[in-house]
From Swiss-Prot:
WD repeat segments: 312-351, 359-400, 404-443, 445-482, 485-524, 529-569, 572-612
Location(s), subcellular: Cytoplasm; Mitochondrion
Name under which the protein is recorded: WD repeat-containing protein 26 homolog
Sequence segments annotated as region (Disordered): 1-90, 604-630
PANTHER family: WD REPEAT PROTEIN 26-RELATED, WD REPEAT-CONTAINING PROTEIN 26
One cellular component (GO) term of this entry: GID complex
Residues covered by the CTLH domain: 129-190
Compositionally biased intervals (Low complexity): 1-13, 609-630
Amino acid sequence: MQSTSSTSSGSCSRPLEGSTLNSGGSAENVARDGGSGDDSVGIGDENPSGSSAATNGHDSKHNGFIVNNNGSSSRIVDGENNRENTSCSGVQLDKSNQEIIRLIGQYLHDVGLDKSVQTLMLESGCYLEHPSATKFREHVLMGDWSKADSDLKDLEPLIDNGKLATITEMKFILLEQKYLEHLDDGNPLDALHVLRSELTPLQHNITRVHQLSSYMMCSTNQDLYQRAKWEGKGILSRALVMERLQTFMPPSVMMSPRRLRTLLQQAVELQSQHCPCHDMAWETNLETVSLLTDHCCTTDGFPMQTIQILTDHCDEVWFCKFSPDGLKLATGSKDSTVIIWDVDPYKLTLKHRRVLDGQAQLSVSFVSWSPDSKLILVGGTEDSHELYIWNVDDGKLVVKFSQSLEDSLACGAFSRDGARFVCGGQKGQLYLCDLNGTIVDSWEGVRVNSIAFRADNKTILAADNHYRIRGYNFDSPRSDFDILREPHPIMTFSINSADRLALLNVSNQGLHLWDIEDKCLVRRFQGIRQSNFAIHSCFGGVNESFVASGSEDKVVYIWHIKREEPLAKLAGHTKTVNCVSWNPVYPSLLASASDDATVRIWGPKPNGSSATTESDDCSSSSSSSSWNMT
């Protein structure tokens, strides 16, 4: 950015006149100033007093430079070495303080406070960048390519120790802009000269040279802008070129654009990573946070204590699942019943709707909801050969599926489009069926513990007795393939809504998180106790930022998806917690099913109460939670 400004010359009392602006800023800032600014501040300009070249030279040994102050103490501008600088006010500035002042100066200029920058630089005795870098910036923004090339020669010893490849790439960037501007001006012969006599001899990025040559055929300037993806001749495109060139320069010579904002953004992101309750749907940037306090998401609205206990089952409750619309909960029990509960999202309470008890002598081990929340698929243990599909609105049995008395149908799931379901078990059957219960296809010899459809509605994932999760595609051509393998039996698993992560409950190992696209183990969550019984975990919270699982130690565990240590331990059940389900629409609700024949509904604590107090709805039973906020 070209601008007239002032800097110090042996005195703190007045600025120099006729010097050049060094912004160290961004393309946006250059565009804002329009490439000029008579009232701007001069920072890092050449010594205007006519002193020798050595005065404005650089000490290559230290990769910095010393500016003559006409008799005053020298100001050492050295961002790479631990050397002190004496400011005009007599304050000794070490390397760290010099860098902070330079960062502040760059930021102040970016927001347009140029007079403040002038005062800061005069009083501190610091410069934002090397004087040769200032000239280089000025000439690039002016489009004076011959002078910019000369400036680059002066800067060579400071850039990557004068490495030829780096200097060549920088020259290429300059000549590329020069070539495009000639085309924009309607000077194809000048552009051709640059292409043949300046760009081609560099022998750099030949593919790009060929691409540039094709722009000679552009019939209009707009065609050139579109094909080259270029802003056109002017201050904005030159500022973007300057940003590219800055990346090659050490920070002691020229800081990268928006450096302070970059550091602050990194700090905010690091704080969000350390936030135990961080909501990953919340965009972490400088516009959404306060820099005056450390970031920490609150636990308001988080399911942290029992708000209701459902006691309608008369035996162990093995499964619970909220519907996709968040307005219903299905619970399945060893007592052969499935109970449908209505969710009041405003009062955060559940009300008994109906009992589905047509599956006589079937201990209900799993329930799967259709995507429209109207149907449920119900199955039993590995000894069961039947599955049931119920309409939850009218309570009618839609399908009773059974292929053979020898079958084991202990797991099943609807497809993501709700048009089909898949089921299987430990005796080697894997059936793909339509909603009438007609077998569309089957796969023999597949012994599975848990099953799920992927989002493509074609691929079925199944955990088998070889400690694997494999993919099965029934479409032509049929295919099966390994997704992942564990060293111990996979008891159950679930897939997140983004269809990228799998949450596995592994025998004697606990809870593991896998990336099923990259096929790698992401995290081992600590805390739960699990032997050889089926425990069902889930993703949940806003944007599925958390995971939860039951445990044989009677506790519900909650983790942030990026932390191995449990975030919360929800106590209240008196026996093993078999299953947990997080409401997908109302993330303040979490359900847990237990061998103690109850289903607990966990919700936010009332305002003013502690995490260990009980709500009025469950005063007859103990309920508490412990929170790990470290």
